[in-house]
Swiss-Prot record:
It is found in: Membrane. The modification Phosphoserine is found at S152. Keywords: Membrane, Phosphoprotein, Transmembrane, Transmembrane helix. Required for endoplasmic reticulum (ER) network formation, shaping and remodeling. May enhance the cell surface expression of odorant receptors. Belongs to the DP1 family. The gene is Reep2. Its main location: membrane. The chain crosses the membrane at residues 1-21, 35-55. Interacts with odorant receptor proteins. It comes from the Eukaryota. One of its GO terms (biological process) is endoplasmic reticulum tubular network organization. This is Receptor expression-enhancing protein 2. It is a multi-pass membrane protein.
Length: 254
């Protein structure tokens, strides 16, 4: 465990950070010799990192494995041994030069196939997502309609239960529950005379109180009202005509 931690620290510090800073200095100073040196190192270190991933799984049980890895990194980086330059010139550069065309073709094919695969997978993913959204919306609509239907049925049952429950009066006694509106209309339709009698038989509290108040108060004197004689129409004067007397002379002559 300790050797693994030490090897990781050596690889990170001496194998990655220090070469990165040296490459920065080479680019800044535009030193072609240093630039070529660190470019060869990074190519060799990339192959080392790829091989390390596999060997850590397969050969980690081997004795002094991590110590050998530390020594290899130092050998690559040391300016005395120049291990990275030796490996690049003897193994890496000849191999890449012989396989360069094949590697370029593989890279081009892989890029095209990966693009086509990505587009095909993307289309399938979009279709699946659209179908899933449609089915989820349909199921959700069905569930929502069922819930609304169940809620409406529950409300009706609750209203019926509330109508059936008796009410408790102020004296603690149970009173019958309120009659439904339809029942009251039916009762009124069956017995209209009874409803009218009950409405007319109730005394008006205002009239009772007013009569009692009038009985308590003393009667006030009222002035007698003089009767005005009616004006009779004037009687029409009748003219009396006296009868004419017969002349006495005429009688004597006869």
């Amino acid at each position: 465990m300790v050797s693994w931690i030490i090897s990781r620290l050596v690889v990170l510090i001496f194998g990655t950070l220090y070469p990165a800073y040296s490459s920065y200095k080479a680019v800044k100073t535009k030193n072609v010799k240093e630039y070529v040196k660190w470019m060869m190192y990074w190519i060799v270190f990339a192959f080392f990192t790829t091989a390390e991933t596999l060997t850590d799984i397969i050969l980690s049980w081997f004795p002094f494995y991590f110590e050998l890895k530390i020594a290899f990194v130092i050998w690559l980086l040391s300016p005395y041994t120049k291990g990275s330059s030796v490996l690049y010139r003897k193994f890496v550069h000849p191999t890449l030069s012989n396989k360069e065309k094949e590697i370029d073709e593989y890279i081009t094919q892989a890029r095209d196939k990966s693009y086509e695969t990505m587009m095909r997978v993307g289309k399938r993913g979009l279709n699946l997502a659209a179908n899933a959204a449609v089915t989820a919306a349909a199921k959700g609509q069905g569930v929502l309609s069922e819930k609304l239907r169940s809620f409406s049925m529950q409300d009706l049952t609750l209203i019926r239960d509330e109508d059936a429950l008796p009410l408790q009066g102020p004296d603690g006694r149970l009173q019958p529950g309120p009659v439904g509106l339809l029942d009251t209309i039916e009762d009124l339709g069956d017995e209209p005379a009874l409803s009218l009698r009950s409405s007319t038989s109730q005394p008006d509290p205002r009239t009772e109180t007013s009569e009692d108040d009038l009985g308590d108060k003393a009667p006030k004197r009222t002035k007698p009202i003089k009767k005005v004689p009616r004006a009779e129409p004037p009687a029409s004067k009748t003219l009396k005509t006296r009868p004419k007397k017969k002349s006495s002379g005429g009688g004597d002559s006869a």
